[in-house]
Amino acid sequence: GWQRPTKTMVDTMAEYLKGKNPDYIEHHYQWLYRSSHFMGSVVQGALSAIDIALWDIKGKRLGVPIYDLMGGKTRDKVRCYMHVGGTTKDDLVASAQAAVKDGFTAVRFTPFPPDYYLHKSYTEWADEAVDRVGAVKEAVGGEVDICVEIHRQMAPAESIWLGRRLEQFNPFFYEDPMLPDSPARMGDVADQCNIPIATGERFTTIFEYEQLL
């Protein structure tokens, strides 16, 4: 898969790094970033791995965790959700209930059945998505948050329409309703849906996040 070309890029960048001072973390990042003429997830994945490794070297040399070098710890624990799934609506509900029983206060799931894109109109599979989200919300109750993961399956207009229909269930977030290629269109979805939008897992630089914000 994609790991092999990323390793090849790490090996390529390693030639520049040999013999250099590993403490010059930002300098090395900027040099490698600016000298990489063709960007993309492979190049940025390699650069990210190198950046993390340089921070790891510095932390080990100083005998401190990396968070101490970045301003210090801000919390002792974080809230987690459980991603749940199921082929049928009943399977999905049972999986969500099991997560709650295990102590999770939030569950994330994709509201579409595995065959949602086969022989169904958009209206049919959107109706099914609303039905599944409603069933999970009813099963877990008001004290548990639901997070709806769309996996970039819809166009902007479809994302807005489905998002508005899901507002009644008060999702904690609405994740990747559309492809992240256009920050402006994602902004339109966020503006027209009363649900927080979660996105960014396909971004590879801080500059993409800047455009989105």
Enumerate the predicted regions with their spans.
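Active-site phosphate/pyrophosphate- and oxyanion-stabilizing loops and adjacent acidic/basic residues
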Residues: D56, D68, G72, G134, ...
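Short glycine/serine/threonine/alanine-rich loop segments
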Residues: G19, V64, F104, I195
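Glycine-rich, aromatic-flanked loop segments that form ligand/cofactor-binding clefts
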Residues: A53-T87
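Active-site nucleophile and cofactor-binding loops and adjacent substrate-binding regions
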Residues: L47, G85, M178, E201-T205
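Conserved, mostly hydrophobic/aromatic
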Residues: M13, I50, G63, V107, ...
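Metal- or metallocofactor-binding catalytic centers and their adjacent structured scaffolds
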Residues: G1-R61
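Catalytic alpha/beta core domains of metabolic enzymes, predominantly
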Residues: D181-L213
